[in-house]
């Protein structure tokens, strides 16, 4: 069986090599690149992201990343956003009172978490969506690794999307599965066996 090809999009943000290694461990053939043709033709595209929403969007625009993601989604070709790579799929992010437009695939804003300790850093359980492909077969007490200060805290998109939630004082979206577009707020590449299972399920679905 031929390995599925995955591009980890290199736009200056994210744990590129750790994502590459994690995907390779679940059987994917992985390239880290900003090349448009490679990103468009791969079976799957991973959009990582760490740091500020605005900085990630600026980096994405430099390599026409918005267009790459949009054209893949329009063609039904799978895209997986991770951490800030999930956040930038929403309409906007609000940091320090400044609103930055996102890719706009999902309506709504990514806003700061309200909790005594920020960032939310460490392991947490999730309430996975019924029928989820990403979390299929995982125990309800499976834990995932989060490092973030901002999140999408409500869903205004398609009612058919599969939504997985986590709680850090208040609920926030931990993962979304919406046709060809999927995303996780946690880092699957840092989440041990549970994260590997999520990546394996995504690769298997390519």
Swiss-Prot record:
Keyword annotations of the record: Amino-acid biosynthesis, Cytoplasm, Glutamine amidotransferase, Histidine biosynthesis, Hydrolase, Lyase
E.C. no: 4.3.2.10, 3.5.1.2
Cytoplasm listed as a keyword: yes
Principal place of residence: cytoplasm
Biological pathway: Amino-acid biosynthesis; L-histidine biosynthesis; L-histidine from 5-phospho-alpha-D-ribose 1-diphosphate: step 5/9
Localization (cell): Cytoplasm
Reaction catalysed by this enzyme: 5-[(5-phospho-1-deoxy-D-ribulos-1-ylimino)methylamino]-1-(5-phospho-beta-D-ribosyl)imidazole-4-carboxamide + L-glutamine = D-erythro-1-(imidazol-4-yl)glycerol 3-phosphate + 5-amino-1-(5-phospho-beta-D-ribosyl)imidazole-4-carboxamide + L-glutamate + H(+); L-glutamine + H2O = L-glutamate + NH4(+)
DNA-binding is among the record's keywords: no
Positions annotated as active site in the UniProt record: 83 (nucleophile), 187, 189
InterPro entries reported for this sequence: Class_I_gatase-like, GATASE, Imidazole-glycPsynth_HisH
Top-rank lineage group of the source organism: Bacteria
Gene Ontology biological-process annotations: L-histidine biosynthetic process
GO CC annotations on file: cytoplasm; peptidoglycan-based cell wall
Oligomeric form and interacting partners: Heterodimer of HisH and HisF.
General function of this protein: IGPS catalyzes the conversion of PRFAR and glutamine to IGP, AICAR and glutamate. The HisH subunit catalyzes the hydrolysis of glutamine to glutamate and ammonia as part of the synthesis of IGP and AICAR. The resulting ammonia molecule is channeled to the active site of HisF.
Protein name: Imidazole glycerol phosphate synthase subunit HisH
Gene behind this protein: hisH
């Amino acid at each position: 069986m031929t390995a599925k090809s995955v591009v980890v999009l290199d736009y200056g943000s994210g744990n590129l090599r750790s994502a590459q290694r994690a995907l390779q461990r679940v059987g994917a053939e992985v390239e880290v690149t900003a090349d448009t043709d490679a990103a468009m033709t791969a079976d799957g595209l991973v959009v990582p992201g760490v740091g500020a929403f605005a900085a990630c969007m600026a980096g994405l625009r430099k390599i026409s990343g918005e267009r790459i993601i949009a054209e893949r989604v329009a063609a039904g070709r799978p895209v997986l956003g991770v951490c800030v790579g999930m956040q930038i799929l929403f309409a906007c992010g609000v940091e320090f009172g400044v609103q930055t437009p996102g890719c706009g695939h999902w309506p709504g804003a990514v806003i700061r978490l309200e909790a005594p300790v920020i960032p939310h850093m460490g392991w947490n359980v999730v309430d996975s969506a019924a029928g989820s492909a990403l979390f299929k077969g995982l125990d309800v007490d499976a834990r995932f690794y989060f490092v973030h200060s901002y999140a999408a805290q409500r869903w205004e998109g398609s009612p058919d999307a599969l939504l997985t939630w986590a709680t850090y004082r208040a609920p926030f979206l931990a993962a979304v599965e919406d046709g060809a577009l999927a995303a996780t707020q946690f880092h699957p590449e840092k989440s041990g066996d549970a994260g590997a299972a999520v990546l394996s399920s995504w690769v298997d679905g390519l």
